[in-house]
């Protein structure tokens, strides 16, 4: 029997290949960083061929280091940085421009024009997204506008567009499959999340030819097999794909309506499963497709926090208050409170529910008695306050009161932060044994498609709790602290 599932986790700064066994345990992992390009301030690009090379390298490393033969791999699941956009020549496989990364703001001008024409409500209704440079649609338009002859070639069917999942499936399959999954398609600003089709009206507004778009398929399905020369002489099913945050929701086994997870990475991404209904947000959230599986599509509400773990990196690298990120916990616990200090880490603006790109970071409540410990604690607490902002919006939009929050990402190792998060939300916070839930969602989706696992019940049974944090704070204190945070955010937004 094929003993392993291979996850390809293609992220913003590195590519990883991870082998999982049938218990959902990590057998071995390989990682390789690649180059970030910043051609102009605010622009972020990747070389799509370098990404492909990094993926091939980590696949080779993980198999050789784990001493696993390619024929022992039952299937491949892909999870990826979302929204990042590649346009390439169908016949040669050569990209016509660098991949424009989700973080890149180079299409902000296009977005401003679209909003000035009053298109925002139309895009929001059809795609569940805001018109923003974050999403793929304006990135495709930018490439077609700026690379000579590109739009004409696209109209003739000579060019293909894909998010990173599509690019990797196309390359692994030797160009046999030009596909994406529902979760990635729902992040493009071109896909109607209600009809589940590329939307002709939106494509016309963006001036993107339909001929270049991939076929949209379920998140758990055999799309193609690897061509032998890319997989050591073996044809292995490429059987699952999902954007990184949706993959984390799946990896956390948040399969029922109202379940939610928060990933504490560079930023924070909170997703709540809303079942088979797309809940339109009135509170600054995105409506997105969680996954398509078992013949149906399920939806999620998503909140994005731009600065989370990067605030702790700032304490370490920018202010040099700590030597390692882990030190922040010990410093925070040396004081009883922040002594009235609030840090609003709006280094690149504020995301959900404010969506204000102009606001900048601020610190409030400083006195002569403020110490380094207070400052570090206030910075950590800002992650929890921002998460509460997002959860309040989710509960208002969905009408669902959260009973438990499942967490993952680098910062969840910080016990102080997790306890404060539970106290502030007044719900238990659950940290799983396997923190690699983004990478875990992809092999689960692929494994279901090839019969490696039989059902979602099998997967839910594998989810293991490492620690549960119970709320201990009284309501009056919780209200007082959160009121102070809201006041600090208002003050920061007023200072422009």
UniProtKB/Swiss-Prot annotation:
Q: What does this protein do?
A: Key enzyme in the regulation of glycerol uptake and metabolism. Catalyzes the phosphorylation of glycerol to yield sn-glycerol 3-phosphate.
Under SUPFAM superfamilies, the record lists: Actin-like ATPase domain
| Reaction catalysis annotation | glycerol + ATP = sn-glycerol 3-phosphate + ADP + H(+)
Listed under GO biological process in this entry are:
glycerol catabolic process; glycerol metabolic process; glycerol-3-phosphate metabolic process
Give the Gene Ontology MF terms in alphabetical order: ATP binding; glycerol kinase activity
What gene is this protein a product of?
glpK
UniProt pathway: Polyol metabolism; glycerol degradation via glycerol kinase pathway; sn-glycerol 3-phosphate from glycerol: step 1/1
Give residues annotated as binding ADP. 12, 16, 266, 309, 410, 414
**Taxonomic superkingdom:** Bacteria
Principal EC category: transferase
Residues holding glycerol: 82-83, 134, 244-245
For this entry, the protein name equals Glycerol kinase
Its PTM note reads: The phosphoenolpyruvate-dependent sugar phosphotransferase system (PTS), including enzyme I, and histidine-containing protein (HPr) are required for the phosphorylation, which leads to the activation of the enzyme.
Question: Which parts of the sequence bind ATP?
Answer: 12-14, 266, 309, 313, 410
The entry sums up its family as follows: Belongs to the FGGY kinase family.
GO cellular component terms listed in the entry, alphabetical order: cytosol
Residues annotated as binding sn-glycerol 3-phosphate are 12, 82-83, 134, 244
Q: How is its activity regulated?
A: Inhibited by fructose 1,6-bisphosphate.
**Entry's EC annotation:** 2.7.1.30
pH-dependent activity: Optimum pH is 7.5.
- Phosphoprotein recorded as keyword: yes
User: The organism's lineage?
Assistant: Bacteria, Thermotogati, Deinococcota, Deinococci, Thermales
Mind telling me which InterPro entries this protein's record contains? ATPase_NBD, Carb_kinase_FGGY, Carb_kinase_FGGY_CS, FGGY_C, FGGY_N, Glycerol_kin
Temperature-activity profile: Thermostable up to 60 degrees Celsius.
Keywords of the record, alphabetical order, are: ATP-binding, Glycerol metabolism, Kinase, Nucleotide-binding, Phosphoprotein, Transferase
Q: At what positions is Phosphohistidine found?
A: 230
Q: Name one Pfam family in it.
A: FGGY_N
